[in-house]
Every structure is written in structure tokens, then in C-alpha cells.
């Protein structure tokens, strides 16, 4: 297993990088998240995951250890391959993926191209406990945020608003200010609906 590679950056693209280590150029598949974090300088370091198949050895690179761990968790789910896991980490920030799994947010996971309702539910079912262990202290924040979101959505639904439309507005509000109280979420949502 190759844990990480440190060397000279030869080529950098949104889907891969080439890093030269001791005269050997390694082609490493990356996510958009990693692409945005890798500096354009010559000396770089990436954490790697090596996938060995009958016909190929493929390297996947990550700017952060946490992203690699999420990738490994995702590919452990039946029906989620390396391409789908990389697509998830390109479409969503690693933190958004873990929060969506921890809060059982099927819609967020399903928003990734190539993931249907069944796969999204399987990802949540298989990984929720593992993700909560990884999150540790942040688990409280996730569940609190999810509770505030659910309470605000229920209140807006009682007021006669469509749950789906209200959900989109509440998501935007929570992205701007994740620590919003239920009352402030409802007030801001009423202004935007």
C-alpha cells in the first residue's frame, strides 16, 4: 500500500495530477476538492489510495487524510465504486458528505450525478454509525443542526408552504449561518418564500 507521495508536481488537472518521485511519474486521480487544495508549487504531497485490480493498479490522491478516509468508507458500500466516490467528493465538500450521512439527508447525497435513491439510502444505512464515530465531538453539532432544520421545516409546512421549496430555502440559510436558531431560520425563510 502506498500511504502518500511527495515530489515534484509535473502536471495538474481537475481530474488528475502527475507527481514525479525519484525519477518516476505517478498518475494520480483526484477530486475537485483536492484539485483546489493542491498548490501550484513544484513540491507537493498527497495522501493516496491504491486500487489493485486484475488489469490495473490505480492511484487516487487526496490533499487531506480525512478526505481519503471518507473515500474509503464510500467505496466500502455495495454499488459505490471509485468513480462514484470521486464524483461525490467532487460535487460536495468532504464535510458535507459526512454531515449528509450523519443527518440522513438522502436528498443531498442523491444530488450527486449517478446516485439514485436506493444507493443514497444504502450509503446512509451502511455508513451512518461509522461516520458518527469519525465525527466524534462534532456529532452534537450535526444532530443539533438537523433538529433545527426539521423543526423549521415542520413550522413552515404548518404555515402552508411546500416542504420541498421550504427545504431549499432552509438549506441556503443554514449554509450561510450553520448555527441559526429555529426562530431565525423561520424568520429568514418567510422573507425568502
Curated annotation (Swiss-Prot):
Record InterPro entries: DNA_helicase_Holl-junc_RuvA_I, Hlx-hairpin-Hlx_DNA-bd_motif, NA-bd_OB-fold, RuvA, RuvA_2-like, RuvA_C, RuvA_C_sf
UniProt KW keywords: Cytoplasm, DNA damage, DNA recombination, DNA repair, DNA-binding
GO cellular component, one term: cytoplasm
UniProt-annotated stretches for the region Domain I: 1-63
Subcellular locations according to the entry: Cytoplasm
Region (Domain II) location: 64-142
NCBIfam families: ruvA
Family affiliation: Belongs to the RuvA family.
Name listed for the protein in its UniProt record: Holliday junction branch migration complex subunit RuvA
Organism annotation: Christiangramia forsetii (strain DSM 17595 / CGMCC 1.15422 / KT0803)
Gene transcribed to yield this protein: ruvA
Amino acid at each position: 500500500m502506498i500511504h502518500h507521495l511527495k515530489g515534484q508536481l509535473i502536471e495538474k488537472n481537475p481530474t488528475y495530477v502527475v507527481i514525479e518521485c525519484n525519477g518516476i511519474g505517478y498518475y494520480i486521480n483526484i477530486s475537485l476538492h483536492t484539485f483546489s487544495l493542491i498548490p501550484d508549487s513544484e513540491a507537493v504531497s498527497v495522501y493516496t489510495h491504491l486500487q489493485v485490480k486484475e488489469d490495473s493498479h490505480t492511484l487516487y490522491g487526496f490533499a487531506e487524510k480525512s478526505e481519503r478516509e471518507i473515500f474509503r468508507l464510500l467505496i466500502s458500500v455495495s454499488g459505490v465504486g471509485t468513480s462514484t466516490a470521486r464524483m461525490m467528493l467532487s460535487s460536495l465538500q468532504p464535510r458535507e458528505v459526512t454531515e449528509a450521512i450523519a443527518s440522513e439527508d438522502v436528498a443531498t447525497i442523491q444530488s450527486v450525478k449517478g446516485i439514485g435513491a436506493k444507493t443514497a439510502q444504502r450509503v446512509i444505512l451502511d455508513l451512518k454509525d461509522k461516520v458518527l464515530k469519525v465525527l466524534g465531538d462534532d456529532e452534537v453539532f450535526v444532530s443539533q443542526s438537523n433538529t433545527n432544520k426539521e423543526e423549521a421545516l415542520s413550522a413552515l409546512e404548518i404555515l402552508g408552504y411546500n416542504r420541498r421549496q421550504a427545504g431549499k430555502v432552509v438549506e441556503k440559510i443554514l449554509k450561510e449561518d450553520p448555527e441559526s436558531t429555529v426562530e431565525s431560520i423561520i424568520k429568514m425563510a418567510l422573507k425568502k418564500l
